[in-house]
C-alpha cells in the first residue's frame, strides 16, 4: 500500500464501494492521486481483487490517459516490490497493456471495431483527419447547393431563406449557417430528432400564453434579475434624499418609482401571464423631477439622478427588447419564421445524410461519428421512447466491474448516455466513479454540459451508505496560503448559482493543505501577497498631479511614432516585473521558490514563470516581442500565425503564380522576395512598361526589351514556365521540395536571423502538402484552395518553435492549455480585455435547450429585428458565457503555487475605479448577480472585490478626491499589493542581465562538484571572471536624442547606477483611430508644435489659419479642436512674443545634429585612452530669433505645470536648454544670449 497520508475525505473516495460516487475535487485537491490509489487498492484487495482490465478508466485527453497508465504502472511496480512473490499483482502489470485506460473517443473506436457488423460499417474503415474531413464537407455542401439551384421550382422556401439571411452577392452566409448548425447538433445523441423538436416549437398557436414557453420563462427570469438589481440602489437613493439638504421635493417621486418597481417585481414573481406583464411594463411612467432649491447638495443630486436614469434605462430596455409584443403578435412572427427554419433544418439533415454517404463510400468516419456510432451500438429506443441498453451493451456491463470517469464536469450528453448504457445502474448495482470540479468546467464551446455534474452534485447524498454518494475534496495541496486566501476572497464575493452556476461558500472554498517548509536563507524572500498591477493606457486633460510630484512634460510621453499599443504597454510592464523578480529588493533579498526535486529553496528561474492569457491571438506575438526585447527567453505555443510568417507567404505566393501567373499581388511578392530579388526600381520599370496590363503581361513585355531589368525578367519567366510544366506531373509536396532546392530559398532563409525557425516553418508547409495528398485529393489548385479555406475558417496553426517549453524559458499560454498544470509563479495578464460576446450577434443563435433564435426578417418590407426567441437565447447565452468566464478565471488563479501576479490595462483609472466603487458598495457579502452580469472583463470582478479589502486604500482612492466609499471593508486573511502605473512608468524598458543568472548557476555547480580538479576549477573561474575590455562601451548608442538624454539624467537623479535605456519597437496609432478615445497629451503637444511652426504670427486670424490647415489636410479635425487659440494669442501678446515679432529673422522647428564625446554623456564610464568614439546628439529647437549679433532661444511646453512652479521647471529642463544653446552656437556661430521656456498652460515665461 502507498505510504501517503490521506485525508479523511480522500480515504473515503479511495475505499467507498458499491455505489455511484461523485467526487467533487477542487483545484489542487489531489484527484489524480486519489484515482490511481483507488485503482491500485481494487486490484490488490485481499478479499475481492479485480483485474486491471476489468476497469474502464475514461480520461479527457490522450495525454491524461498516458499519464494515468504510467502512474498506475509505477504504483503496481512499487506494490510488487513490497509484495514479493505475489503472482496476482505481477499479473496486473502484464494486463495493464490491454487495460481500458483511454479517452471516451478511443473507447468508442474500440466498441465500433469490435461490433462493426451491428451498424453495417466497413470493418477496414479509417478515421478522416481534419484536412480530409474539411474538404469532404466542402465538397458535399457545394454539391447540395448546386442541386438546389438546378431544381429551383421545387425549392422556393430555400430562396426565401436566401433572401432573408443570405448575403447580397452569394450564398456563403447560408453555407456557413448550415455548417455551424450541423457542427452544433453533433453533441446531441440523435441530431435529427433534436432539429425536428426545436423547429416544431415555432409552430406556436395564437391564443396561447407566450410566458409558458421555455423562451418566455427565461425572459421572465432574466427580467426579474435585472429588476431586483435596482432594489438596493433605489432604496439607497431614497435614503440619500432624506439625509441631504434641499432635495425634499425629490422624495415623493422616488418613492413612487420605487413602489412601481416593487409591483413589477411582484408580478414577475407571481407568474402573471405574458400579456399582463406586457401591459404593465409599457404603462410604467416616470414623472418629471421637480426643481430643487439653490441650497440643494449638488453631489447628492447628481448621484440620485444617475440612479433614476439607470432605472429608466432598465425599464426602457425591457420595453424595447423583451416586452415589445403581445403573445398573439409573437405567435404571428413564429408562424412566419416556421417554414424558413424548417428549410434550414432540412438543409442540415440533407447535408448530414450526404456527408455520411460520402464517408461510407470511402470507408471512412470522422471524429464525431465515433460517439454516435458507439451510441447506436450500445443504445436503443423502445416503443415508449425510453432509451435502454442493447445486448452488446450488456456484454460491456458484464466486462467492467467499475467505470471511472476523470474530468466528469466536461462530459456531454452523448458521453453520458454511453456511460449509462454500460454501467450497472439499471440493474440496481451502480458502479460509476466520477471525479471532477464543476468550477473548472470551461469547455461549453465544445458543448460540454456542466449541468450533468451539477444535477448529481445537488441530488447525491453525503451519507456513506447511499447508493448515490458525493464526497467533497476541497483541501488544496498545491498553493501557498497567500494564494489560496486570495482566491477564496475573490470567489466568495463573485460566484453564485446565477452567475457561475455554483454558490462559492464556506463549503466550496479551498482549504490550504500544501506544506511549504520555512526558508532558512535570510537573503531570499518567498511567497508574498497577491499582486494586482493596473496600467492606465491614456491620460486625459484632467490629469491631477499628486502632491510633490513633478510636472509632466509632453516629451516625457512617447513621440507620435512611439505611442505604445495597449497590449504592448501591459507586456512591457510584465517584462519589467519579471526582471524585478531576479533582482534584489530594497532589503537586498532575491525571490526564491521551492524546488520539489531538490527538496530545497533556490532562486527563481525563467522556467518557473508562466504568463496566462485568456486569448493568445494578437497577445502572444506582442508579449513575446516585448520579453525578447528585454532579453527574457520566452516560449509561446500560439497555435496560430503559421500562414502569416514571411517565408511561408513567399512560398504560397510562388505556388499561386505557378498555378495562375495573372495574380498581381502574389507575383509582386515573389518578385520582391530573395527568390527573384527585384528592387523597387526594377518593379517600377516593369510597371511603366505597360501601366494598363497585369504585372505578368508587363513582365513579359519587359523581358523582350533591351533594358537593365530585361535579363532578370527573362530568366524568371523561363523558370516560371518550367515550374508550371513540372506542376502538371509532380505531386504538390514534390514540387515544393524541388522549389526549395532549385531556388535556394530554403538555404537563404536558414542564413537569416532566426533561420532555424524559418526553415522549420518551410518543412511544416512541405509536410502539410504531403499530408494533404495522402487524402483522396490532389493537385496544386486544390491544395491552394484548401490552404485558403484553412485561413478563412480559423484553421491556422502555430509557427515552428526552436525553443522548447522544457527549456529555461518563460512560458506563454492560454488559460485553457494551462488546465491541469501548476507553476511556481503565475502572471495572469490581459484582465482588462473585453469578454468575447460576438456569438450573440449572429443572425441565428443556437442553444442546447432553447433551440433556434433567429432574427425576424421580412425582406419584402425590408424589416429586420431580433425575434423574441433570439432575445431569450441571447440573455441565456450571456449568463452562461459569463458563468464560464468566471470559471476560466478560477482555473487561471488556481494554477499558481507560490506567487500570483494579476495585470490589466484600463483606459482611464479614475472612471474605471468609480465604476468598480459602485459595485463594491453593495452591502451584501456576495455581489448581486445583476452586478456580476454587467462585467465586461475580469477586472470588473476582481477590482470591486479587492476594493472592499482592508489593504485596498490605493484602489479606493483611485476613484478621485472627494469620492466617499460607503461599502463594507473586509478584514480578510488574504494579502494584496496594488500597483497603479501609467505610461511614464514603462517609458524606459528594462533589460535582463543575462550573465547574472548563468554565472550563479555555474558557480553553484562548481561548488557542488567540490572534488573537481583544482587546476580545472581555477581555469574555469579565470574564464568566468574575464571581461571584454570595451564591454561597457558596447552598450553605447551611436546616436541619442535630447529627450532621451533628459530622461536618462532625470532617472539617474532618482536612482543610482541607472543605465540609459531605449524604447523598443513601438506601434503608431492609425489616423482613423485618433478620434475614438481622444488625443493623448503627447499628441496634443505635437499638434500645437505643428501649428506654432506654420502660423503667420503677423496675421491675427489664428483660428482662420488653423481652418486652412485642416482644409489642406495638414491637420485633422480632432487635432484642430485640441488647439487652444487663446493660449497662442496670449503667447504672441506676451513680452517675449512681441520681441519675436519685432525680430527680422525668426526660425522655428530647427533640427540639429552635433557630436559629443562619450564621457560627456556617460561620465561613469572608465577613461580609455584608445577609445575615441563620439555620440551623435539629435534634437529640434522650437524657436529662436536674432537680435543684433546674438540669439534668443524659446522652448514651448504644452503640458500641465502648476502655476508659479518655475524653479522645478528650471531644474527639469536645464540640461535640455543647455544642449539646445550649444547646438545653436555651433550651427550659427553666434552667441545664445537669452534662453526662455514659455508655459502654455499658465502663460508664464521662465528665464533659464
UniProtKB/Swiss-Prot annotation:
The keyword Nuclease belongs to this UniProt entry's keyword annotation: yes
GO cellular component: cytosol; DNA helicase complex
Keywords tagged on the record: ATP-binding, DNA damage, DNA repair, DNA-binding, Exonuclease, Helicase, Hydrolase, Isomerase, Nuclease, Nucleotide-binding
GO molecular function: 3'-5' DNA helicase activity; 3'-5' exonuclease activity; ATP binding; ATP hydrolysis activity; double-stranded DNA binding
Top-level taxon: Bacteria
Transmembrane region(s): none
Catalyzed reaction equations: Couples ATP hydrolysis with the unwinding of duplex DNA by translocating in the 3'-5' direction; ATP + H2O = ADP + phosphate + H(+)
EC number: 3.1.-.-, 5.6.2.4
Residue ranges of every copy of the UvrD-like helicase ATP-binding domain listed in the record: 4-480
Domain UvrD-like helicase C-terminal: 523-820
Cofactor(s) the protein needs: Mg(2+)
Any single GO BP term: double-strand break repair via homologous recombination
Entry keyword annotation includes Isomerase: yes
Subunit structure comment from the entry: Heterodimer of AddA and AddB/RexB.
Functional description taken from the UniProt entry: The heterodimer acts as both an ATP-dependent DNA helicase and an ATP-dependent, dual-direction single-stranded exonuclease. Recognizes the chi site generating a DNA molecule suitable for the initiation of homologous recombination. The AddA nuclease domain is required for chi fragment generation; this subunit has the helicase and 3' -> 5' nuclease activities.
HAMAP family documented for this protein: AddA
Family: Belongs to the helicase family. AddA subfamily.
Record PANTHER family: ATP-DEPENDENT HELICASE_NUCLEASE SUBUNIT A, UVRD / RECB / PCRA DNA HELICASE FAMILY MEMBER
Protein name: ATP-dependent helicase/nuclease subunit A
Organism: Ruminiclostridium cellulolyticum (strain ATCC 35319 / DSM 5812 / JCM 6584 / H10)
Amino acid at each position: 500500500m502507498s505510504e501517503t497520508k490521506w485525508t479523511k475525505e480522500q480515504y473515503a473516495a479511495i475505499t467507498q464501494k458499491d455505489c455511484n460516487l461523485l467526487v467533487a475535487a477542487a483545484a489542487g485537491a489531489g484527484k489524480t492521486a486519489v484515482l490511481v490509489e483507488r485503482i491500485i487498492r481494487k486490484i490488490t484487495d485481499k478479499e475481492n481483487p479485480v483485474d486491471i482490465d476489468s476497469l474502464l478508466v475514461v480520461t479527457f485527453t490522450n495525454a491524461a490517459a498516458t499519464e494515468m497508465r504510467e502512474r498506475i504502472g509505477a504504483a503496481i511496480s512499487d506494490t510488487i516490490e513490497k509484495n514479493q512473490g505475489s503472482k496476482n499483482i505481477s499479473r496486473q502489470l502484464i494486463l495493464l497493456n490491454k487495460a481500458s485506460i483511454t479517452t471516451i473517443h478511443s473507447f468508442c473506436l474500440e466498441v465500433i471495431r469490435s461490433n462493426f457488423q451491428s451498424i453495417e460499417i466497413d470493418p477496414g474503415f479509417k478515421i478522416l483527419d481534419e484536412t480530409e474531413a474539411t474538404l469532404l464537407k466542402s465538397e458535399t455542401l457545394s454539391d447540395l447547393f448546386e442541386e438546389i439551384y438546378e431544381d429551383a421550382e421545387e425549392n422556393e422556401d430555400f430562396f426565401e431563406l436566401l433572401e432573408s439571411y443570405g448575403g447580397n452577392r452569394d450564398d456563403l452566409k447560408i453555407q456557413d449557417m448550415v455548417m455551424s448548425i450541423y457542427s452544433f447538433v453533433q453533441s446531441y445523441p440523435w441530431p435529427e430528432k433534436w432539429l425536428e423538436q426545436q423547429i416544431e416549437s415555432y409552430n406556436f398557436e395564437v391564443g396561447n400564453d407566450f410566458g409558458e414557453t421555455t423562451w418566455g420563462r427565461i425572459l421572465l427570469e432574466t427580467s426579474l434579475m435585472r429588476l431586483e438589481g435596482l432594489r438596493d440602489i433605489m432604496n439607497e437613493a431614497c435614503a440619500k434624499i432624506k439625509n441631504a439638504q434641499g432635495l425634499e421635493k425629490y422624495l415623493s417621486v422616488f418613492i413612487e418609482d420605487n413602489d412601481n418597481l416593487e409591483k413589477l417585481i411582484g408580478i414577475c414573481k407571481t407568474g402573471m401571464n405574458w400579456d399582463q406583464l406586457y401591459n404593465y411594463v409599457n404603462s410604467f411612467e416616470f414623472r418629471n423631477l421637480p426643481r430643487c432649491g439653490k441650497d440643494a447638495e449638488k453631489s447628492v443630486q447628481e448621484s440620485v439622478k444617475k440612479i433614476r436614469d439607470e432605472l429608466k434605462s432598465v425599464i426602457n430596455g425591457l420595453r424595447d427588447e423583451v416586452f415589445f409584443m403581445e403573445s398573439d403578435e409573437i405567435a404571428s412572427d413564429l408562424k412566419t419564421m416556421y417554414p424558413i427554419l424548417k428549410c434550414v433544418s432540412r438543409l442540415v439533415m440533407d447535408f448530414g445524410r450526404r456527408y455520411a454517404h460520402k464517408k461510407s463510400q470511402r470507408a471512412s468516419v470522422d471524429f464525431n461519428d465515433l460517439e454516435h456510432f458507439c451510441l447506436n451500438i450500445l443504445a436503443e429506443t423502445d416503443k415508449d421512447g425510453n432509451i435502454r441498453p442493447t445486448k452488446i451493451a450488456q456484454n460491456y456491463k458484464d466486462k467492467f466491474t467499475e467505470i471511472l470517469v476523470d474530468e466528469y464536469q466536461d462530459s456531454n450528453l452523448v458521453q453520458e448516455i454511453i456511460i449509462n448504457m454500460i454501467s450497472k445502474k439499471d440493474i440496481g448495482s451502480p458502479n460509476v466513479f466520477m471525479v471532477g470540479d464543476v468550477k473548472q468546467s470551461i469547455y461549453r464551446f465544445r458543448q460540454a454540459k456542466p449541468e450533468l455534474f451539477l444535477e448529481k452534485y445537488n441530488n447525491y447524498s453525503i451519507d456513506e451508505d447511499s447508493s448515490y454518494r458525493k464526497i467533497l475534496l476541497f483541501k488544496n495541496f498545491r498553493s501557498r496560503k497567500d494564494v489560496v486566501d486570495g482566491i477564496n476572497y475573490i470567489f466568495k464575493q463573485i460566484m453564485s448559482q446565477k452567475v457561475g452556476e455554483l454558490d462559492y461558500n464556506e463549503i466550496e472554498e479551498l482549504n490550504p493543505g500544501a506544506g511549504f517548509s520555512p526558508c532558512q536563507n535570510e537573503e531570499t524572500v518567498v511567497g508574498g501577497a497577491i499582486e494586482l498591477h493596473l496600467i492606465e493606457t491614456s491620460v486625459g486633460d484632467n490629469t491631477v498631479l499628486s502632491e510633490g510630484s513633478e510636472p509632466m512634460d509632453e516629451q516625457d510621453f512617447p513621440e507620435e511614432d512611439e505611442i505604445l499599443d495597449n497590449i504592448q504597454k501591459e507586456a512591457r510592464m510584465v517584462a519589467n516585473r519579471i526582471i524585478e523578480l531576479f533582482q534584489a529588493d530594497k532589503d537586498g533579498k532575491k525571490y526564491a521558490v521551492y524546488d520539489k526535486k531538490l527538496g530545497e529553496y533556490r532562486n527563481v528561474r525563467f522556467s518557473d514563470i508562466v504568463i496566462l492569457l485568456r486569448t493568445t491571438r494578437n497577445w502572444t506575438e506582442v508579449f513575446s516581442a516585448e520579453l525578447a526585447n528585454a532579453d527574457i527567453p520566452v516560449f509561446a505555443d500560439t497555435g496560430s500565425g503559421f500562414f502569416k510568417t514571411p517565408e511561408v507567404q513567399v512560398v504560397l505566393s510562388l505556388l499561386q503564380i505557378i498555378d495562375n501567373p495573372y495574380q498581381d499581388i502574389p507575383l509582386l511578392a515573389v518578385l520582391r522576395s530573395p527568390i527573384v530579388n527585384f528592387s523597387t526600381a526594377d518593379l517600377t520599370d516593369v510597371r511603366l512598361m505597360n501601366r494598363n496590363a497585369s504585372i505578368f503581361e508587363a513582365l513579359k513585355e519587359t523581358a523582350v526589351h533591351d533594358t537593365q531589368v530585361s535579363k532578370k525578367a527573362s530568366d524568371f519567366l523561363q523558370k516560371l514556365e518550367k515550374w508550371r510544366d513540372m506542376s502538371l506531373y509532380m505531386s504538390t509536396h514534390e514540387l515544393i521540395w524541388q522549389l526549395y532546392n532549385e531556388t535556394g530559398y530554403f538555404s537563404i532563409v536558414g542564413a537569416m536571423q532566426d533561420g532555424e525557425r524559418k526553415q522549420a516553418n518551410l518543412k511544416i508547409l512541405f509536410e502539410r502538402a504531403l499530408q494533404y495528398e495522402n487524402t483522396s485529393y490532389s493537385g496544386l489548385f486544390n491544395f491552394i484552395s484548401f490552404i485558403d479555406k484553412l485561413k478563412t475558417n480559423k484553421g491556422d496553426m502555430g509557427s515552428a518553435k526552436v525553443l522548447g517549453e522544457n527549456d529555461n524559458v518563460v512560458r506563454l499560454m492560454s488559460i485553457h492549455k494551462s488546465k491541469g498544470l501548476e507553476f511556481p509563479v503565475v502572471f495572469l495578464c490581459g484582465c482588462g480585455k473585453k469578454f468575447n460576446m460576438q456569438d450573440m450577434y449572429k443572425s441565428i443563435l443556437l442553444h442546447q435547450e432553447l433551440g433556434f433564435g433567429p432574427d425576424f426578417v421580412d425582406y419584402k418590407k425590408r424589416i429586420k429585428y431580433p425575434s423574441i426567441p433570439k432575445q431569450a437565447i441571447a440573455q441565456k447565452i450571456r449568463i452562461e458565457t459569463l458563468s464560464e468566464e468566471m470559471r476560466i478565471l478560477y482555473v487561471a488563479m488556481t494554477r499558481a503555487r507560490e506567487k500570483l501576479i494579476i495585470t490589466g490595462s484600463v483606459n482611464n483609472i479614475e472612471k474605471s475605479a468609480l465604476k468598480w466603487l459602485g459595485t463594491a458598495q453593495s452591502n451584501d457579502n456576495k455581489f448581486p448577480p445583476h452586478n456580476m452580469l454587467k462585467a465586461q472583463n475580469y477586472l470588473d470582478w476582481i477590482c470591486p472585490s479587492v476594493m472592499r479589502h482592508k489593504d485596498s486604500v490605493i484602489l479606493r482612492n483611485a476613484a478621485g478626491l472627494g469620492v466617499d466609499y460607503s461599502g463594507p471593508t473586509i478584514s480578510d486573511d488574504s494579502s494584496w499589493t496594488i500597483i497603479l502605473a501609467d505610461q511614464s512608468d514603462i517609458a524606459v524598458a528594462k533589460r535582463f542581465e543575462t550573465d547574472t543568472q548563468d554565472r550563479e548557476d555555474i558557480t553553484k555547480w562548481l561548488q557542488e562538484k567540490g572534488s573537481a580538479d583544482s587546476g580545472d576549477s581555477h581555469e574555469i573561474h579565470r574564464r568566468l571572471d574575464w571581461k571584454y575590455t570595451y564591454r561597457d562601451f558596447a552598450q553605447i548608442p551611436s546616436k541619442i536624442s535630447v529627450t532621451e538624454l533628459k530622461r536618462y539624467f532625470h532617472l539617474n537623479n532618482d536612482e543610482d547606477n541607472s543605465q540609459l535605456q531605449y524604447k523598443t519597437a513601438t506601434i503608431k496609432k492609425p489616423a482613423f483611430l485618433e478620434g475614438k478615445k481622444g488625443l493623448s497629451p503627447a499628441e496634443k503637444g505635437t499638434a500645437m508644435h505643428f501649428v506654432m511652426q506654420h502660423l503667420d504670427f503677423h496675421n491675427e486670424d489664428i483660428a482662420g489659419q488653423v481652418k486652412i490647415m485642416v482644409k489642406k489636410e495638414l491637420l485633422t479635425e480632432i487635432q484642430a479642436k485640441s488647439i487652444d487659440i487663446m493660449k497662442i494669442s496670449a503667447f504672441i501678446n506676451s513680452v517675449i512674443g512681441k520681441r519675436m515679432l519685432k525680430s527680422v529673422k525668426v526660425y522655428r522647428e530647427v533640427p540639429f545634429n552635433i557630436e559629443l564625446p562619450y564621457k560627456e554623456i556617460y561620465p561613469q564610464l572608465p577613461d580609455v585612452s584608445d577609445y575615441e568614439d563620439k555620440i551623435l546628439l539629435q534634437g529640434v529647437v522650437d524657436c529662436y530669433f536674432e537680435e543684433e549679433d546674438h540669439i534668443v532661444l524659446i522652448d514651448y511646453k504644452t503640458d500641465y505645470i502648476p502655476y508659479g512652479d518655475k524653479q522645478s521647471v528650471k531644474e527639469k529642463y536645464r540640461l535640455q536648454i543647455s544642449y539646445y544653446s550649444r547646438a545653436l552656437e555651433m550651427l550659427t556661430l553666434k552667441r545664445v544670449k537669452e534662453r526662455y521656456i514659455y508655459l502654455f498652460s499658465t502663460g508664464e515665461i521662465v528665464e533659464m
